[in-house]
């Protein structure tokens, strides 16, 4: 059924009926490859067939066998497995296999091999394969460095040569060449006549080795027993079975001392050696210590002999000498000495030395936890056991005794074995703690990065808020600047308006002053007023060419319809207001001139006779009355239906601001509506001249209707122009003639003026 033992072992190792790997069969496969019973090429071909099995368990076990031969069979298998074709086969196998556990195992193997041969250019194909698989998106498991450790020793490759490597005899047809399995060199038949197993290469059966390698391999066992007896020439004549047996390896000479004596001597030498080494190490430290600590160190008890070896097996932790462990735990005692020296040097004043110091009361600087104390005790105990074991082995080697017969060595070995398992548990626990602390450190790093990112975001947010605040402040300043500009413009307009009002007020005051000066000048020129002249018939004075007519033409330039006269009716005041400008008594005011009746219009002056029945109303006036008193022209009687308006002294006109109601001058009465009783001027008698009622004219009736319908609003003519005209008229007027016709009556439509306001 099976062609060879390799096929049988491979079938057992890759059977799908197994629940766990068959490690004995796997190790036998490795031994067969190392012993050259199977070539690496054939072995790898058989394993590839098992890898392509449809059963996932068989495929997984075949990968486990492949991993074992790669780790244990050395360079020949490496050169066979890590070729370019086989690496491409691994990639295709990963793509084609439907089983997840097989795929993960293959990825783990590729990663382990790539890491193990990362520094070797000879196996570049497996590293390229891993790179390609990563590029394709395959996820590799976590790498464990322990899986990538290839520490197994492999047999060297066979060298080739034409002569023997030892005796230099040339190989011929009859003198065949042979290779030593231990060193790999080529030898003749006589130089490779011996055989022995090679456990370090995984070769359990006896194989051909050269004489030099055989002597080197047999020297540790034969040299320990025959170191003092010397080499025996008869050993070569003994059979190989006897030489390989345990009897030949034992000491053949009788022991000079008993086992108990040797044990006691060995323990004594061990204690002396430990004491000497401890003293040598503590000597430089004791020189630096203060005298008190040195004396306390001298009072420490001396070490005692260790207990019997038989107690090691029963109580492994209590087998060590506590005093010896105290000496071996140097770090603890050094720390105690440092603490003692620091406690002694801390007080400023020297304190007296107590007679009996108690070192056990002095606590170390750092208080250790219970787990740390337990681990320290275990480490000290194991260190002591290892040193005792090493010293025992050295003692046996120096005395030439067999180790197999020493029960103390065996007991120490069993004790160290039990301590080793406990040490592994402690190591695992420490590794777990280390990983936990590393995770904490990673989390702290993440927290630190997160805090840095948060601080950066906070800074950006603060910067953003600052920019927003600056933008708002800039907009607020712009708005304030615009408002300030608008307010400045309004202020300038208001100041300009106030300036105009002030200038206008000053102009009005100047006009008033000029008007007053002109009035005073006119009054001064006119002199005192004369009594009114009597009524003159129209026939007594010629109509045209008389001096009075010329005087009227010169002196009355405001009469309507006459050349040189201004239009009738009140003119608007130059200041834009409709208030009445008062004229002092005795001054002719053309603004209140009434329309002349038909008998007094130009061309018909003094043509109508006096009304009969009232001759006494107008006494006769001398003809030269106008010549002596030119102001008498202004005192002519008006119509009988309209009383002469009183002369109101001039008052300054108040300035009116646009948008406000016109203010009335205090003390000024409103003008009297026609039909009321006229007011008389103080100091002057009203004169009534009987005048015939003129025929009503349509134009006058229309004017009177408008005046009755509208409220009376007295308007003053331009004061400056009136004053200038009056001054020119008075200056250029000739002497009045003797026969002066009657003056033109004032307009009858003039409403009644307000009461006279005195300046007193």
From Swiss-Prot:
Region: Disordered, residue numbers: 275-323, 338-359, 602-626, 644-760
Keyword rRNA-binding found: no
Locations listed in the record: Cytoplasm, Cell cortex; Cytoplasm, Perinuclear region
Pfam families per the UniProt record, alphabetical: FYVE, Hrs_helical, VHS
Residue ranges of domain VHS in the record: 13-141
This protein's UniProt keywords: Cytoplasm, Developmental protein, Metal-binding, Phosphoprotein, Zinc, Zinc-finger
GO cellular component, one term: cell cortex
Superkingdom field: Eukaryota
Residues in FYVE-type zinc fingers: 158-218
Binding site for Zn(2+) 1: 164, 167, 188, 191
Annotated residues for binding of Zn(2+) 2: 180, 183, 210, 213
Extent of Pro residues compositional bias: 349-358, 609-622, 734-744
One of the GO BP terms on file: exosomal secretion
SUPFAM superfamilies: ENTH/VHS domain (SSF48464), FYVE/PHD zinc finger (SSF57903)
GO MF annotation: an example: phosphatidylinositol binding
Modified residues (Phosphoserine): 300, 302
Domain UIM: 263-282
The keyword Phosphoprotein is assigned to this record: yes
InterPro entries from the UniProt entry: ENTH_VHS, HGS/VPS27, HRS_helical, UIM_dom, VHS_dom, Znf_FYVE, Znf_FYVE-rel, Znf_FYVE_PHD
Ranges of Low complexity composition bias in the record: 653-694, 706-733
Basic and acidic residues bias: start-end ranges: 307-316
Family annotation (PANTHER family): HEPATOCYTE GROWTH FACTOR-REGULATED TYROSINE KINASE SUBSTRATE (PTHR46275:SF1)
Oligomer status and interactors: Homodimer; in vitro. Interacts with ubiquitin.
The protein's role, per its UniProt record: Essential role in endosome membrane invagination and formation of multivesicular bodies, MVBs. Required during gastrulation and appears to regulate early embryonic signaling pathways. Inhibits tyrosine kinase receptor signaling by promoting degradation of the tyrosine-phosphorylated, active receptor, potentially by sorting activated receptors into MVBs. The MVBs are then trafficked to the lysosome where their contents are degraded.
Name the record gives this protein: Hepatocyte growth factor-regulated tyrosine kinase substrate
Source species: Drosophila melanogaster
Gene encoding the protein: Hrs
């Amino acid at each position: 059924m099976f062609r060879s033992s390799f096929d049988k072992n491979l079938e057992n190792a890759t059977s799908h009926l197994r629940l766990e790997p068959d490690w004995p069969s796997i190790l036998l496969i490795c031994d067969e490859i190392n012993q050259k019973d199977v070539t690496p090429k054939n072995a790898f071909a058989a394993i590839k067939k098992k890898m392509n099995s449809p059963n996932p368990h068989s495929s997984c076990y075949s990968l486990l066998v492949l991993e074992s031969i790669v780790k244990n069979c050395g360079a020949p298998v490496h050169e066979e497995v890590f070729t370019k074709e086989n690496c491409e086969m691994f990639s295709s196998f990963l793509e084609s296999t439907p089983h997840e556990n097989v795929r993960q195992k293959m990825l783990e193997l590729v990663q382990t091999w790539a890491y193990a041969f990362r520094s070797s250019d000879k196996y570049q194909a497996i590293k390229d394969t891993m790179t390609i698989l990563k590029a394709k998106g395959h996820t590799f498991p976590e790498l464990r460095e322990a899986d990538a450790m290839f520490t197994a020793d492999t047999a060297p490759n066979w060298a080739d040569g034409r002569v023997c490597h030892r005796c230099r005899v040339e190989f011929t047809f009859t003198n065949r060449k042979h290779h030593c399995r231990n060193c790999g060199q080529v030898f003749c038949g006589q130089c490779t006549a011996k055989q022995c197993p090679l456990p370090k290469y995984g070769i359990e059966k006896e194989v051909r080795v050269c004489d030099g390698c055989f002597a080197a391999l047999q020297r540790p066992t034969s040299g320990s027993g025959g170191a003092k007896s010397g080499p025996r020439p008869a050993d070569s004549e003994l059979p190989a079975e006897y030489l390989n047996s345990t009897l030949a390896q034992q000491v053949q000479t009788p022991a000079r001392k008993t086992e108990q004596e040797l044990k006691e001597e060995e323990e004594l030498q061990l204690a002396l050696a430990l004491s000497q080494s401890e003293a040598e190490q503590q000597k430089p430290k004791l020189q630096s210590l203060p005298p008190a600590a040195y004396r306390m160190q001298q009072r420490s008890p001396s070490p005692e002999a260790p207990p019997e070896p038989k107690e090691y097996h029963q109580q492994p932790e209590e087998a060590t000498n506590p005093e010896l462990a105290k000496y071996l735990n140097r770090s603890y005692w050094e720390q105690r000495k440092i603490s003692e020296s620091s406690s002694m040097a801390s007080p400023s004043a020297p304190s007296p030395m107590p007679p009996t110091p108690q070192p056990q009361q002095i606590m170390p600087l750092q208080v250790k936890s219970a787990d740390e104390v337990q681990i320290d005790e275990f480490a000290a105990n194991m260190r002591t056991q290892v040193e005792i074991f090493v010293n025992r082995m050295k003692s046996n080697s120096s005395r030439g005794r067999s180790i197999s017969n020493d029960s103390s060595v065996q007991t120490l070995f069993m004790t160290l074995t039990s301590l080793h398992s406990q040490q592994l548990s402690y190591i695992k626990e420490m590794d777990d703690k280390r990983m936990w602390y590393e995770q904490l450190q990673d989390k702290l790093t993440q927290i630190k990065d997160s805090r840095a990112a948060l601080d950066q975001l906070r800074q950006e947010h603060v910067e953003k808020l600052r920019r927003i605040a600056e933008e708002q402040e800039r907009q607020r300043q712009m708005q304030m600047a615009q408002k300030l500009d608008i307010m400045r413009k309004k202020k300038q307009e208001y100041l300009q308006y106030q300036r105009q009002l002030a200038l206008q007020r000053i102009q009005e005051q100047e006009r008033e002053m000029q008007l007053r000066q002109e009035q005073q000048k006119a009054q001064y020129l006119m002199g005192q007023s004369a009594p009114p002249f009597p009524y003159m018939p129209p026939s007594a004075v010629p109509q045209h060419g008389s001096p009075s007519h010329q005087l009227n033409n010169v002196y009355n330039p405001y009469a309507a319809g006459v050349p040189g006269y201004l239009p009738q009716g009140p003119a608007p005041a130059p200041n834009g207001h409709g208030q009445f400008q008062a004229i002092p008594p005795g001054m002719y005011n053309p603004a209140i001139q009434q329309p002349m009746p038909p008998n007094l219009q130009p061309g018909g002056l003094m043509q109508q006779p006096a009304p009969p029945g009232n001759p006494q109303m107008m006494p006769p006036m001398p003809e030269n009355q106008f010549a002596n008193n030119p102001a008498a022209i202004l005192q002519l009687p008006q119509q009988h239906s309209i009383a002469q308006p009183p002369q109101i002294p001039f008052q300054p006109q108040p300035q009116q601001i646009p948008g406000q109601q016109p203010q009335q001058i205090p003390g000024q009465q409103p003008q009297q509506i026609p039909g009321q009783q006229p007011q008389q001027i103080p100091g002057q008698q009203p004169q009534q001249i009987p005048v015939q009622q003129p025929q009503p004219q349509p134009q006058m009736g229309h004017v009177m209707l408008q005046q009755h319908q509208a409220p009376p609003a007295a308007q003053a003519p331009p004061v400056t122009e009136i004053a200038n005209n009056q001054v020119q008229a008075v200056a250029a007027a000739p002497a009045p003639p003797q026969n002066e016709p009657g003056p033109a009556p004032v307009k009858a439509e003039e409403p009644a003026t307000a009461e006279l306001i005195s300046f007193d």
